[in-house]
Amino acid sequence: MRLLLVFFFLSLLDQAPPARSGISRVRICREKGGHCDADCHLEERHLGGCRAAYLTFCCRKESPR
């Protein structure tokens, strides 16, 4: 029975996404001068992905031309 519980908890841990990569992507986005948001606004450019919880896009305001 204990062995079954161990495999159950290991399978739950295996499905959890790693948090380290999300934190580092948010930091990289901020270094580029952007911010993480669920959706980029019309005047913003999509730089990449943050993948931290629900804030999936790295957005930065476009420079006026």
From Swiss-Prot:
<keyword id="KW-0732">Signal</keyword>
<comment type="function">
    <text>Has antimicrobial activity.</text>
</comment>
<keyword id="KW-1015">Disulfide bond</keyword>
<feature type="disulfide bond">
    <location>
        <begin position="36"/>
        <end position="50"/>
    </location>
</feature>
<feature type="propeptide">
    <location>
        <begin position="62"/>
        <end position="65"/>
    </location>
</feature>
<dbReference type="GO" id="GO:0045087">
    <property type="term" value="P:innate immune response"/>
</dbReference>
<keyword id="KW-0929">Antimicrobial</keyword>
<feature type="disulfide bond">
    <location>
        <begin position="40"/>
        <end position="59"/>
    </location>
</feature>
<feature type="disulfide bond">
    <location>
        <begin position="29"/>
        <end position="58"/>
    </location>
</feature>
<keyword id="KW-0165">Cleavage on pair of basic residues</keyword>
<dbReference type="InterPro" id="IPR025933">
    <property type="entry name" value="Beta_defensin_dom"/>
</dbReference>
<keyword id="KW-0044">Antibiotic</keyword>
<dbReference type="GO" id="GO:0042742">
    <property type="term" value="P:defense response to bacterium"/>
</dbReference>
<keyword id="KW-0211">Defensin</keyword>
<comment type="similarity">
    <text>Belongs to the beta-defensin family.</text>
</comment>
<dbReference type="GO" id="GO:0005576">
    <property type="term" value="C:extracellular region"/>
</dbReference>
<keyword id="KW-0964">Secreted</keyword>
<dbReference type="Pfam" id="PF13841">
    <property type="entry name" value="Defensin_beta_2"/>
</dbReference>
<protein>
    <recommendedName>
        <fullName>Defensin-B3</fullName>
    </recommendedName>
</protein>
<feature type="signal peptide">
    <location>
        <begin position="1"/>
        <end position="21"/>
    </location>
</feature>
